Amino acid sequence: MTAQPTQSVTWNDATARTVLRQLFDAAVRCADPGEAVRRHLPERPVGRCVVVGAGKAAAAMAAALDAAWPDVDVSGVVVTRHGHAGAAGHDASAPQQGGATASACTATSERPAASGSVAVAATGGIPVAGGLAAAGGTAAPSRITVLEAAHPVPDEASVRASRRILQAVQGLTPDDLVVALISGGGSSLLTLPAAGMTLADKQAVNRALLHSGATIHEMNVVRRQLSAIKGGRLAQAAMPARLCTLIVSDVPGDDPAIIASGPTVADLDGWLDVIGENRSVSDRETGGDTDRGSAGDADQARRPEVAGAASADPQAQAREIVARYGMQLPPAALQVLDTPQPPVRPHPDHTLHIIAAPMMSLQAAASAARDLGLTPLILGDALEGEATQMGTVLAGIGRAVALYGQPLPAPAVLLSGGEATVTIGPQGAGRGGRNTECLLAMALALGAQRGVWALAADTDGIDGTEDAAGALISPDTLQRARAAGLDPRRFLQDHDSYSFFAALNDLLVTGPTGTNVNDFRAILIA
């Protein structure tokens, strides 16, 4: 059923909030990892199929593959964030509008039932009864084990899971197939310290990266060099089996070497990077698969400078990033970066598909907005920078639409993706995430501007380390805050945006969505 034209809608706070939630839900539904996996199943193997993977969408991806191949010899292990093992799909509370999601991302909004042959396991790797239940409601024998570990700072469970994954791909033959299911969050979940480093060293590195203000590209360039499993090392361990990597992208530009720090993508792979002018509009509209056979089969395309070209020294790049942000890394990590390492060999029989990505979800939200009578404008899927600065800039664009009808007239919605950063100073931080911090800065910049509402949230359902996906703001946000005795500037200064929005009851709480295509921001002007 098509929504009524906006001209017949009375825009009030409740309506605007409902519409923003509908747009967020459309974006998340489009990134349904199970549906995406089913659309990109590789050729069946002659021998065994070993499934490995890491990320916030790993459980749903594994369940979909397992259910699709009941007659194939499937086994394996994947790792996801604590509490995400049962997140087989997004349960949108807002009603779906007009089937816009299906047209925008070539996916349906139907949610798959969890496969009965994927079992949730404790951190020790022992299947837990009644994990992901079969359709009949009882747990079935496990073929793919789902482990849980910590995010964003790894724990001992991350190390155990990584060892299990490496063990799973040992001793295979060219007749066997390894399917690597990679999604956002994998950099922490897939943790195996490089020789000479300990878990404590890796934890210290992660904290330094998270507090530095570095972009996700820069952080993962460093992580790749300090790991015994990332940076193509998982692919190298899987030889001589055939390898297929299915990726749900959560990084600006969809660079497969950066997503989860590229466990199956070596520095010398020369993978085609799906960014900027190197990716056509038609690729964006169809999901932009990056389908590759041998690493040398396609033309080399430019990566973002920070990620480096294939000819650059990745260790030197990592050292430069550490120096640029003044990171204090453990001596063992610095020693690894200073010691020349043998190059990781690219896998000779590797196919890679990016099966869901931020731009696909933004287009799904834009389609839903049009069905609601709004004019959408996608500002981009790769917005980066300090969360406070991003919020201020986005507020300026929203104000221009409200006051001058530029760059487009109201009623309209401005959509964007990417990943903001939050630089934590020596004074420490309160409770917050990059999306709530961006929104708080936006609210301050907008002031009491009439007719502007906004939502910013992480599509995985968790903004930072808190239990909310993000939050919403409205024209009366600052007025309500001051009436409650809250000083919004102090909350922003203390990086305590979660507490600010919690006090106003403006947090967006979804629970784990089972997918992750980075941040989603929508500014509604009516």
Label the predicted regions.
Residues 241, 266-274, 296-393:
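Accessory alpha-helical/coil subdomains and C-terminal extensions
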Residues 4-7, 83-141, 271-312:
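Intrinsically disordered, low-complexity terminal tails and inter-domain linkers enriched
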Residues 2-50, 59-71, 77, 131, ...:
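N-terminal glycine-/serine-/threonine-rich phosphate-binding loop
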Residues 2-48, 52, 85, 258, ...:
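N-terminal amphipathic/basic leader segments beginning at the initiator methionine
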Residues 82-87, 136-174, 222-223:
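Glycine-rich oxoanion-binding loops at beta->alpha junctions
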Residues 437-526:
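Internal helix-turn-beta structural module
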Residues 210, 216-274, 288-317:
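A glycine/threonine-rich phosphate-anchoring loop and its flanking beta-alpha core
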